[in-house]
Amino acid sequence: IHVYPEHRDHDPERGDLIPANTPYMLISQGSSGSDQAHLEALAMILAAFRPDTKQRLRETGLIAPTVQMIYRRARVGVRSRAAYLSGGAHPTAFRASDIALARMVGLANSIGPGDIPPLVQLQVLEETQAVEGHDDFGEGLSERLFDTPSAIARIWRSRVGRRSMVVTAADTVDPNGRDLRFDWVLLRGDPDRVRIEPVTEDGRYARIEMDWQGPMPSPGAPDILSHRIDIGVFANNGVHDSAPAFVSVLLPHHEARTYETGADGVPRAVTTGGQATGGTYADPLLFPADPDGTR
């Protein structure tokens, strides 16, 4: 697990500039040195595992996912399963003041080798395919930021007002052969403009439909605007929930766009192009400048 300070990438002045959420690292709120408390917490969790559990974690390659679950599940304010399955438990950047070492150590020590949660593995089966030139986005640019087993990220470059995805967690296997049930949860974004529909009874497949939307306050940090939709996927083996897997979509709110909802309920672009007012920052690696200097 890597730990990095956010250093001006997650602040009230410019908002949340991180393009995607992942369970592979922790981002600390603050600048250099803000990572130290989180590193200590991770070390304490590792030290608290029972020897037989730690051996089983090594054998299954599940040390990091289990540590991630414990760190997130035992933070200040995450006292229930409902709280864990919410955006507040999975922020972009973590505050040191939310670390609860005693709870983290206690949870780590309570996990037996037969109760280890699985690693959620995702795959996109279908998704809206924008047509370059027709849907107006940059030449040679893809809307796919990355696809990894536990994190999928997209950039909403096209002018389409609604996009959908069918995602599966069917490759997820419990290390001890337990039956699994899945929860798909909107962690951030406008709940009136995101719809998640499990396709199967156990939740291994889900259809996600998203409408264009404006920035929203970040969960747990309302003074920081977020330009991202995050959906968390959790597997429960009857004892513990897994660490989250994420589907993230970054919206380019530095662009001036206007959408209107048609009679069929689908948003359609009225105006696109140009810079939004307020000087919203855009990462030049994700949004290269056009020859006229605009993005």
Model-derived features: where do they sit?
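Structural beta-strand segments of beta-rich domains
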Residues: 118, 163-167
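Acidic, Ser/Thr
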Residues: 168-176
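Low-complexity "stalk/linker" and mucin-like segments enriched in Ser/Thr/Pro/Ala/Gly
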Residues: 122, 133-134, 142-157, 177, ...
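Extended, non-transmembrane interaction/recognition domains
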Residues: 1-145, 149
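Extended alpha-helical scaffolding regions
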Residues: 240-295
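Exposed beta-strand face motif in extracellular beta-rich ectodomains
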Residues: 225-231
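Conserved structural position at the C-terminal beta-strand
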Residues: 235-237
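Short beta-strand elements bearing conserved aromatic residues within extracellular beta-rich modules
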Residues: 182-184
